[in-house]
Amino acid sequence: MYQIIKREQFGPVTFLWEVVAPEVAKACHPGHFVMVRTDETGERIPLTVADFDRAKGTVTVVIQAVGKTTHQMMGLAEGTSVLDFIGPLGVASHLEKREKVVLVGGGLGVAPVFPQLRLHKELGSYTISIIGFRSKDLMFWDDKFAMYSDEFRVATDDGSFGTKGFVTVVLDQVLKEHKGIGEVIAIGPLPMMKACAELTRSYGIRTMVSLNSIMVDGTGMCGSCRVTVGSKMKFACVDGPDFDGHLVNFDELMLRQKRFECEEKECLQRFEAERKRLAELGEGGANPAVPVGRKRPGIEDLAALPEVIPPPATRVVKNMRTIAPKRTPMPEQDPQVRSRNFEEVAQGYTMDMALAEADRCLQCKKPRCVPGCPVGIDIPGFISALGRKDLKDSYRILKSANTLPAVCGRVCPQEVQCEATCIVGNKLEPVAIGRLERFVADFAVGRGWDKAPEGKPTGKKAAVVGSGPASLACAGDLIKAGVDVTVYEALHVAGGVLKYGIPEFRLPNDTIDIEIEALAKLGVKFELDCIIGKLFTIPQLMSEMGYDTVFVATGAGSPKFMGIPGEAYNGVVSANE
C-alpha cells in the first residue's frame, strides 16, 4: 500500500497527492508517469509525475476528476492509501542545457512541465515559463514556477490574471521578443499543444509535446495511445510520452482521444446515480459495491471426489478394434447461456468420462505422442496412472515435465502436437490428451500435492522478468533445481499474456491463479508492480541485489504495422491489443 501523506485541492475537480513510494521516487526523472490503482476493483489510471523527492521518498501527482475512477480518487482523504503505485513508466525527457528554453503549461499540463523547468534551471538554461488557466481561481503552482523561472508569465482565458487569452498569445510575444531560443516544451490539452507546435514551426525551434492525456493501460498493450509521429506509428506510453510536436499527427490524435468518450460518460452517470441513491438511503454516498465474480458452471465437483479411489476392474488387452473409435465428448455450456456470459465454455470431464477416454490409450511401447509434446511429458505414463485411478501419481508425472498442466490442458494446441502424432489417430480419432491433462490438473486443486522441492538449495539466486507462461515455466524448473527464484512483474497481477491475452471463456483467471499459487507453495516469490529497466535495472539485479542470473521473458508486446492509410483510426486494432 502507498500512503497519501499530502492532499491539496486546487479547484472543483483538480487536486494533488503526495504519495510515499521510495523506490519509485528514487528512479523518477522528468517526463515519467505512474499507474495508480486505488483498490482491487479499481481501474489503472496513468498520471504524469509532477514532482518527486528522493530524500523523502515521495512522488507528487496532480489529478483532474474526469471519469468515475478519478472522481472516486478525489474522495480519498490525506492519510489513506492506494493499492498500486506503479512506475516510473515511459521514457524520461531528454533535456540538455540551452541558451534559452520556453516551457508552456496549460491547465493540468502545468504540473508535468514543472520537473522539466526545474531541471533546465539546474542545467543552467535561461528559463522562460508560461502557464495558462481558464481563470485566476483555477491557478496553482505559480509560486513554484516563479522560483525557477528567469521570466515568468501567466495567461487566463477570462483575463482575471496576467494576459487575457490562451498561452499561445503569450508564446507568440516571447518568440518575437527573444532570439536564441533553443527549445519549446509544451504540455496541456491536445489543441493547445498543436497550436504551440504550429506557432514555432516557422521559427524552426525544436518543440516537444507530452501525450500523456491519451494513455489508458500504460504498457502499450491496449493500443489506445497509438500516435503517428512522422511516418511511424508510436505508443505514447512506451515510446513517449514526449514527442517532436512538429511530427505529431494531432488531427488523428484528437479523434483517438474521443475513443472511449461515450463509455466514460455513461460510467460516470451510473456512478453519480448510484452515489446519489446511497446518499438518500443515509449511507453518506459511499462508493457502490462491486459484485464478486460468479462461480463458473460445472458438471461435477471434482473437489468432492475422494483422493483415494478404488482401482478399476481388470481390463482386457486393447487394440484398435476394441477401443472406442471416437473420443469422449466434453460437455459445454449451452450456446443460449454462454452467449450471455464470459464463463468457460468447455466444462471439463467427469471422472467417468476421463476414465473412458483414458481407456482409449493403447499404451504404445514406442509412443509417438511423447516426442510430439514440446516439453516431453510421459503421456502414456500419466494416462496409465489415471486409468488405474492413481490421480496423485498421474499429477506427479505431469508436473515433473510441465509446470502449468491446467493451463496447457486448456490452451496448448495438442491437435498439431501430441495428438497429431498419436498412433490411435492413424485409424480412429486420437486420444484427447489435452482434456485428460486438464482433468488431472483440475482434480489436484486444493489437495496439497504441490510441495517444496526436497533437494538441497544450491545457494544460487535467479530473477525472472515478466510472469507470462515462459517465466512461470522457467521459475518452476529453477525452484525444483534448488534455485532461489523471484519473479518481477510490471503489472499488478501475475500471469502475463495468460491473463490479458486469452479471454476467460477459453482460460479462466482462477485457473491461472491456481497455477501461480502452486508455484508460490514451491517457494517462488512474486514481486508485482516492478518495472525492470526503470524501477530496477538488470545491472542492479546482478550486483547490489545479489542475483546470479536473470531470465528476461517480456513477450511480444509490440505489434508491427503495415504503414497503410487508416491504420490509426479508431476501431482498427492490432493482433497484440
Indicate where each model-derived feature is located.
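Residue-level detector of alpha-helix initiation sites
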Residues: 107-110, 191, 221, 403, ...
